[in-house]
């Protein structure tokens, strides 16, 4: 009896001293996906939605399908607060996570992407920078491990200028107009400036760059400058708390909100609802729409939320623009891993192997329909040379309660964007001593 008591006590002590298997801790036949989220700070409202949707999709695949061809997805969150100081340690902490290292990183922070870009290539860990990150990384010949998928900042800016041209009665009507680019003064906000100025020269409109110091809650001086300039249009590249502050400032300046065009990080419910009436008639681009009518969103609600398994504590945000963007991120992550399994086998894969899956990803209308995501995402075809794979956006307008889509897919100026991407990537390659891949030889 004494031996039994001692044995039980020893077993209990060992159990208590052993670390509990937390969500994301890998075991055999598991695929690890890092989640470098930001749930605190001035960008938390966006981060909780995007990463909540991302986690929900991975959990959905595990619960409904048992993983990807039998390989369970695991993950671990690491709080970046949308800062490089925290983002870099998160990268270093998670990149070598067992059993096979990080599948890919989706930081949703341009500054962090810039900070880890070189080391990710060395470490052979893909960076999936859906609608963010370094634009010239769209040239996969120079940046084999970076994927600015769906659309990049330069493509989107040409979409916005094209939309303004359509609203003005034709691209020739842009000549003589005044257009402001109001942007958060960080790497992300500055990214469109080069092509914005290029398009000003092409179409003859007068440009003005107006930076907003982060986090962007005080814009009094910026809107005084805008009023003095008297622009026909204001393009906004904002994020987080800057966006509702921008809409309120525009209202105080009596500037018509239907002539304020935000980018796809300036067009969510988290931006418009806090601004109240000041947001009515405001327009933004979108890469994915809001809504819960999509089959995939309805399936997630049934499989996860009806059973208390969802990640979002505020269920009213399910189906928001940014939540759905997280679902889109999950779809791309899972389908890239699935594609890579087709080549390397149904087993846990390395970052180098998932990179191949990303570069050979082909989401056509048929596959999107099978995923229940028709209307949620646009077709995506990635190649060795083209790591963007899409480029089109739609536009939406806030009616005071919800977003209404007001355009079809608008295609970017692909020649202009590609010429600039290749020139910038070539300069980077020369500076770093990189020999671009020959895609005719299979990358």
Where are these regions (language model features)?
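Extracellular/periplasmic Venus flytrap/periplasmic-binding protein
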Residues: 86, 135-136, 144-254, 291-298
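Short, low-complexity disordered leader/linker segments with a strong preference
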Residues: 1-32, 427-443
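Extracellular/periplasmic periplasmic-binding protein-like sensory domains
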Residues: 143, 250-330, 410-413, 424
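Periplasmic-binding protein-like
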Residues: 94-108, 126-130, 178-183, 230-240, ...
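Beta-alpha junction/loop-to-helix N-cap segments that form part of ligand/metal-binding clefts
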Residues: 24, 30-32, 45-52, 63-140, ...
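Glycine- and acidic-residue-enriched helix-capping/strand-helix junction motifs
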Residues: 42-52, 187-192
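Segments of small-molecule ligand-sensing domains
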Residues: 309-323, 334-408
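Venus flytrap/periplasmic-binding-protein-like
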Residues: 80, 127-129, 135-138, 215, ...
């Amino acid at each position: 009896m004494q031996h039994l008591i001692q044995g039980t006590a020893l077993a209990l002590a060992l159990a208590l001293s052993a670390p509990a298997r937390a969500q994301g801790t890998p075991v055999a036949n598991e695929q690890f996906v890092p989640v470098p989220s930001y749930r605190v700070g001035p960008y938390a409202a966006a981060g909780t939605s995007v990463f909540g949707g991302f986690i929900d999709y991975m959990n959905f695949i595990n619960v409904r399908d048992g993983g990807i061809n039998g390989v369970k997805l695991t993950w671990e969150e690491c709080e970046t607060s949308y800062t490089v100081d925290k983002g870099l340690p998160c990268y270093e902490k998670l990149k070598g996570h067992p059993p096979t290292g990080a599948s890919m990183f989706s930081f949703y922070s341009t500054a962090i992407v810039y900070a880890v870009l070189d080391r990710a290539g060395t470490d052979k860990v893909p960076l999936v920078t859906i609608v963010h990150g370094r634009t010239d990384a769209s040239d996969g010949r120079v940046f084999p491990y970076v994927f600015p998928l769906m659309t990049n900042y330069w493509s989107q800016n040409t979409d916005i200028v094209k939309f303004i041209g359509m609203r003005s009665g034709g691209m020739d009507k842009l000549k003589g107009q005044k257009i402001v680019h109001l942007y958060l003064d960080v790497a992300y906000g500055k990214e469109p400036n080069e092509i914005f100025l290029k398009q000003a020269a092409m179409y003859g409109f007068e440009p003005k760059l107006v930076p907003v110091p982060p986090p962007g809650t005080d814009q009094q001086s910026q809107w005084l400058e805008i009023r003095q300039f008297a622009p026909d249009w204001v393009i906004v590249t904002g994020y987080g708390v800057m966006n509702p502050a921008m809409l309120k400032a525009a209202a105080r300046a009596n500037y018509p909100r239907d002539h304020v065009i935000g980018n796809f990080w300036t067009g969510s419910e988290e931006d418009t609802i806090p601004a109240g009436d000041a947001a009515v008639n405001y327009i933004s681009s979108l890469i994915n729409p809001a809504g819960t009518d999509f089959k995939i969103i309805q399936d997630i609600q049934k499989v996860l939320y009806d059973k208390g398994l969802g990640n979002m504590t505020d269920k009213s945000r399910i189906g928001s623009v940014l939540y759905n963007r997280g679902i889109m991120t999950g779809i791309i992550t899972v389908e890239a891993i699935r594609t890579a399994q087709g080549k390397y086998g149904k087993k846990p894969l390395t970052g180098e192997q998932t990179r191949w899956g990303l570069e050979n990803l082909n989401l056509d209308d048929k596959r999107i329909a099978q995923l229940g995501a028709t209307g949620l995402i646009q077709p995506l075809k990635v190649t060795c040379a083209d790591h963007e794979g899409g480029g089109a956006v739609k536009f939406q307008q806030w009616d005071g309660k919800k977003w209404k889509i007001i355009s079809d897919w608008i295609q970017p100026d692909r020649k202009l964007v590609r010429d600039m991407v290749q020139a910038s990537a070539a300069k980077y390659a020369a500076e770093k001593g990189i020999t671009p891949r020959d895609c005719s030889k299979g990358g």
